[in-house]
From Swiss-Prot:
SUPFAM superfamilies: FAD-binding/transporter-associated domain-like, Uridine diphospho-N-Acetylenolpyruvylglucosamine reductase, MurB, C-terminal domain. GO terms for cellular component: cytosol. GO terms for biological process: cell division; cell wall organization; peptidoglycan biosynthetic process; regulation of cell shape. It comes from Rubrobacter xylanophilus (strain DSM 9941 / JCM 11954 / NBRC 16129 / PRD-1). It is found in: Cytoplasm. NCBIfam families: murB (TIGR00179), PRK13905.1 (NF010480). The active site is at 170, 220 (proton donor), 290. InterPro entries: FAD-bd_PCMH, FAD-bd_PCMH-like_sf, FAD-bd_PCMH_sub1, FAD-bd_PCMH_sub2, MurB, MurB_C, MurB_C_sf, Oxid_FAD_bind_N. The keyword NADP applies. It catalyses: UDP-N-acetyl-alpha-D-muramate + NADP(+) = UDP-N-acetyl-3-O-(1-carboxyvinyl)-alpha-D-glucosamine + NADPH + H(+). This is UDP-N-acetylenolpyruvoylglucosamine reductase.
Length: 297
């Protein structure tokens, strides 16, 4: 859609913008139009306008757990992580906009003596992405603390609880409705000792730093297979260091696929499929991707 329509409809957007600049994997072709709304109202207006003119909409959060294909994304891409970070605390309830960063929420609530989100320090993503994926770490997950989320669906804002959202392991009903958009979410917390909570966060942060590679990756590539861990399975299959193009199975943690510099989405997808095939052949284990793939080849 390069006939000037997008420029007329969304003058505040960036056009033909390389999305590798906005993803943790440093991979991704161009967005026809990339909009970073400064308010929820601007977001609502953009989605409504896109719908009226038949412009497809893709929403990105913090760029983790997502692979943008090399052909980029057609239509309008909306990135939430830049501005939609509003947060409000009322008693033991936290309400955060979709672009708020999970580690920031973990630190903020811990410092105020509110427990429940310490696990979020290990999730380098946004509220919107965390609800979409039911993100979790260190024995907890979003579903355990989520009260509700406001979802833009079919032109209306609908408040949905955890059951309505169908939260399960790294999944929600949002996977089946790519046009739905998380606007904000509320969390039920409980009192805790600030120093104890901060110490727990420090421990989680140390675990993450020691167990994660220092090269660009999307985070966890595959979901946990029943009764096991994907990193252990991939390592047991002898696949650490396996490489396609500039994408490599990390030698630090085998469930992280790292970009050595200049890697492409096609490299990443080929490596993911190769790892799945070899794990299946050698160990009889079926790995399911955790990463969300968007865009065109």
């Amino acid at each position: 859609m390069h006939d000037g329509t997008l420029q007329r409809l969304f003058p505040a957007a960036k056009f033909d913008e390389p999305l590798r600049r906005y993803t943790a994997w440093k991979i991704g072709g161009p967005a026809d139009a990339l909009l970073e709304p400064s308010s929820i109202q601007e977001l609502l207006s953009a989605v409504e306008l896109a719908g009226e003119h038949g412009v497809p909409v893709t929403v990105l959060g913090g760029g983790t757990n997502v692979l943008v294909r090399d052909g980029g994304i057609r239509g309008l891409t909306i990135r939430l992580a830049k501005s939609l970070r509003g947060v409000k605390l009322s008693g033991e309830t936290l309400v955060a906009e979709a672009g708020a960063l999970y580690p920031v929420l973990a630190n903020m609530t811990a410092s105020r003596g509110l427990a429940g989100l310490e696990f979020a320090t290990g999730i380098p993503g946004t509220v919107g992405g965390a609800v979409f994926m039911n993100a979790g770490a260190y024995g907890s997950e979003t579903a355990r603390v989520l009260l509700w989320a406001d979802i833009l669906r079919d032109g209306r804002v609908v408040r949905m609880g955890p059951e309505e959202l169908g939260l399960s392991y790294r999944r929600s009903i949002l996977h089946d409705h790519p046009g739905w958009v998380v606007l904000r979410a509320a969390y039920r917390l409980h009192p805790g000792d600030p120093e104890d909570l901060r110490e727990r966060i420090r421990e989680f942060r140390t675990l993450r730093m020691n167990g994660s590679p220092n090269r660009p990756s999307c985070g966890s590539t595959f979901k946990r297979p029943p009764g096991d861990f994907p990193g252990r399975v991939i390592e047991a299959a002898g696949l650490k260091g396996l490489r396609v193009g500039q994408i490599e199975v990390s030698t630090v943690h085998a469930n992280y696929f790292v970009n050595l510099g200049g890697g492409t989405a096609s490299d990443a997808l080929r490596l993911m499929e190769l790892v799945r095939e070899r794990v299946r052949e050698r160990l009889g284990v079926e790995l399911e991707p955790e990463v969300r793939v968007v865009g065109e080849p």
